[in-house]
């Protein structure tokens, strides 16, 4: 997946090979859904060593990543609006993939803190509807992610039910806007 600065580059830098593909796709869009932000934090994780050390060693990096996202996200929305001025843009904020998973409890609270900080970057950005995926996942008693550790990486992606909930939250946000 992309980090927010990579997506911004794809949308704004004509020298990038992805630029034409992205702008061509967006040009005629009526609705744009965006899922961005989680990889801004995920790239800082190194689960091959001691979790406590990883967290303490990267604390300032997590803070900087959250701040940088808060600066980059509004630019992404402006770039999309520049290409597709009439499109409705819906974004799902970031959920905590460790929620409800017993084996990840030591990371859960720390992750929650930085995810909440990162999610502030979605607030007060004009021209975008924000679906509260974080609360939907946090309030659920269902398993919504395929959380797994493979080699030295974490797979935090939603399972089929998790994708359904994300879609439901985005649809609810669109319907709220229409009424």
Question: What is the predicted function of each stretch?
Answer:
Residues 1-67, 71:
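Conserved SGNH/GDSL esterase-like catalytic core that processes O-acyl groups on lipids
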Residues 55-68, 108-116, 153-156:
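A short acidic, glycine-rich active-site loop
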Residues 97-133:
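Substrate-gating cap/lid alpha-helix
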Residues 150-179:
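Histidine-centered active-site loop/cap adjacent to the catalytic His
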Residues 30-35, 88-93, 129-132:
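Structural recognition of the beta-strand scaffold that forms the well-ordered cores
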């Amino acid at each position: 997946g992309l980090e927010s600065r990579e997506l911004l580059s794809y949308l704004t830098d004509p020298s990038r090979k992805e630029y034409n593909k992205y702008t061509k796709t967006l040009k005629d869009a009526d609705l744009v859904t965006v899922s961005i932000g989680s990889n801004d934090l995920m790239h800082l994780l190194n689960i091959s060593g001691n979790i406590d050390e990883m967290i303490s060693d990267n604390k300032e990096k997590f803070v900087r990543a959250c701040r940088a996202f808060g600066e980059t996200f509004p630019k992404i929305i402006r770039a999309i609006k520049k290409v597709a001025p009439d499109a409705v843009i819906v974004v799902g904020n970031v959920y905590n993939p460790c929620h409800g998973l017993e084996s990840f409890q030591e990371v859960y609270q720390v992750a929650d803190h930085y995810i909440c900080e990162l999610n502030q970057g979605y607030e007060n950005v004009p021209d975008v509807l924000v679906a509260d995926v974080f609360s939907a996942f946090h309030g659920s008693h269902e398993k919504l992610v395929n959380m797994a550790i493979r080699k030295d990486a974490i797979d935090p992606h939603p399972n089929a039910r998790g994708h359904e909930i994300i879609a439901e939250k985005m649809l609810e946000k669109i319907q709220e806007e229409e009424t």
